[in-house]
Amino acid sequence: MFKKFDEKENVSNCIQLKTSVIKGIKNQLIDQFPVIEPWLNQIMPKKDPVKIVRCHEHIEILTVNGELLFFRQREGIFYPTLRLLHKYPFILPHQQVDKGAIKFVLSGANIMCPGLTSPGAKLYPAAVDTVVAIMAEGKQHALCVGVMKMSADDIEKVNKGIGIENIHYLNDGLWHMKTYK
């Protein structure tokens, strides 16, 4: 999604949101990530301006005080940015890939089933279309945000094909876009 993303070329405009819209977004975030509720006022303080940065390909990035927090495509579900995920690692369930998959994930490749079932990888129970944080063997922070394309049970049984779709990874265009004022 952000492989060829460039802040100067892809950002079209930035809009400050009304409080009623912010409430709706907060409720949507709580529905989507229930564990975030106690931390939401810390992540999105009431007095701070919340803005939506509109980009090409119908991508919207939610910012507070210039800090990029969440993004979505075509009014779909919200995904946390990796910067937010590094501050609050508990908001998404984790899956762990082995050391051999790290360089491929960091180049934007989807996570294949063998990278989740080999020694060094850890596959936790998760349903299809669950947003997950991809951790790496021996590393502390998440290296990508992805969406489960198969359930954890199916990944273990089939062990072929794409298991998790890579949505946002370290060093992609969104990662390089540190803040937006």
UniProtKB/Swiss-Prot annotation:
**Localization of this protein:** Cytoplasm
What the entry lists under Pfam families is as follows: Pre-PUA, PUA
Q: Which GO terms describe its biological process?
A: formation of translation preinitiation complex
Residue ranges of every copy of the PUA domain listed in the record: 92-171
Identify a single GO molecular function assigned to this protein: RNA binding
Sorted keywords for this record are: Cell cycle, Cytoplasm, Growth regulation, Transcription, Transcription regulation
Identify the stretch annotated as signal peptide in this record. Answer: none
One GO term describing the cellular component: cytoplasm
The text the record gives for the protein's domains is:
The PUA RNA-binding domain is critical for cap binding, but not sufficient for translation enhancer function.
What the entry lists under NCBIfam families is as follows: unchar_dom_2 (TIGR00451)
Q: What does this protein do?
A: Plays a role as translation enhancer and involved in cell cycle regulation.
Family classification: Belongs to the MCTS1 family.
Listed name of the protein: Malignant T-cell-amplified sequence 1
- Organism in which the protein naturally occurs: Gallus gallus
Q: Which gene encodes it?
A: MCTS1
